[in-house]
């Protein structure tokens, strides 16, 4: 895990050699870029990973609706469902049910978020890890 973390970091960056053609920015941006790429080149399969937390963004729902209504066959959407957004928990059952209505072919992947003892409450989002904290996460 440490080797992969050191190689790729915590957020994907443009790395064409490994099939990552776009680095994303704001939440909801990745899926809209993926839809554009799928439209521009219908002979290639496009894969996009979104999260349950970012699914609160309107652009995500607009993109899902567009994929379904346009019958865009060359895009695969994967949702990392860990039950957390930036500052709060996500109602996973409600979200997954709603996602499947918008796009029945959506791929749901359930993951878990480790709860480390040094991360507590809303301030956890802004926690600066000590070296000891960092080593305990690997």
Each predicted region: which residue ranges?
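Glycine/aspartate-rich loop-and-adjacent alpha/beta segment that forms the canonical ThDP
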Residues: 97-138
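A short, conserved beta-to-alpha structural element at the edge of catalytic cores
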Residues: 69-98
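Short, well-ordered coil/turn elements that cap or connect secondary structure elements
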Residues: 41, 72, 101-103
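Short acidic, glycine/serine/threonine-rich loops at helix termini
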Residues: 59-61, 87-91, 117-122
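Short beta-strand segments
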Residues: 38, 49-50, 78-80, 111
């Amino acid at each position: 895990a440490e080797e992969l973390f050191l190689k790729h970091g915590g957020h994907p960056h443009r790395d064409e050699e490994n099939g990552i053609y776009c680095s994303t920015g704001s939440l909801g941006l990745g899926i809209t870029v993926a839809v554009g790429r799928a439209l521009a080149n219908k002979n290639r399969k496009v894969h996009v990973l979104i999260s349950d937390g970012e699914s609160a963004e309107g652009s995500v729902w607009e993109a899902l609706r567009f994929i379904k209504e346009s019958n865009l066959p060359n895009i695969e959407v994967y949702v990392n469902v860990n039950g957390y957004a930036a500052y709060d928990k996500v109602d996973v059952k409600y979200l997954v049910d709603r996602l499947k209505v918008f796009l029945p072919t959506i791929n749901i992947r359930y993951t878990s978020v480790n709860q480390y003892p040094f991360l507590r409450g809303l301030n956890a989002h802004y926690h600066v890890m000590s070296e000891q904290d960092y080593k305990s996460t690997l």
